[in-house]
Amino acid sequence: AASDVYKRQRGGLKLDHACDVFGLDLTGKVCADIGASTGGFTQCMLEHGAEFVYAVDVGHGQLDESLCNDSRVKNCEGVNARYLTANFFDRPVQFISGDLSFISLKLVIKSLCDCLCDGGEMVLLIKPQFEAGKQALNKKGIVKDRKDHVRVITELLGCFRAEGLAAEKITISPVKGGDGNLEYLILLKNADMTADKLGQLNIKEFVNEAFDSFKD
């Protein structure tokens, strides 16, 4: 359906932006797209030279047919990211993307970290609407208060570092979430903390910049 194509393209735009801004090279890499849905991120990885992509989603029958038929893609349906382990994959995963809804990244980061090989990289979409708590949402499901965005990013950075992931870079997603929420993309590395470049990040300034960039 046309709406599926649109959804896939929107997803692809987000990871495409991350590849550009973060200077990612996926050439020849084995990747996992967690929360694959229609496959926007999977498609993007292939376009950026990925050798193989595991398209993982808790749902069924969502992945675009062209990707289902692609020998470089394994469609892993009905898989809950919370319970993923490295054993699930028959090859070491060098790059993970995460575009998850209705669940906090705090609940899946341990599993994702376990699945990523040493030195591997991860790009996660931070969605404040699934992190901030119900009290932070307005009637339309939007997290309007900048303070809540600052809190979400601060807490997640602590959570990622506690799992031994170095937070390298963060950027604003070029498109809002389907519900109209501002979202962020973060690059994490399964490496020692010398790779952590966000220790000096002024999160409040970064959030203000994000809000200002979407002012009409």
PLM features: residue spans?
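Conserved SAM-binding loop of SAM-dependent methyltransferases across substrates and taxa
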Residues: 38-49
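Glycine-rich helix-loop-beta junction characteristic of Rossmann-like nucleotide cofactor-binding loops
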Residues: 20-27, 89-90
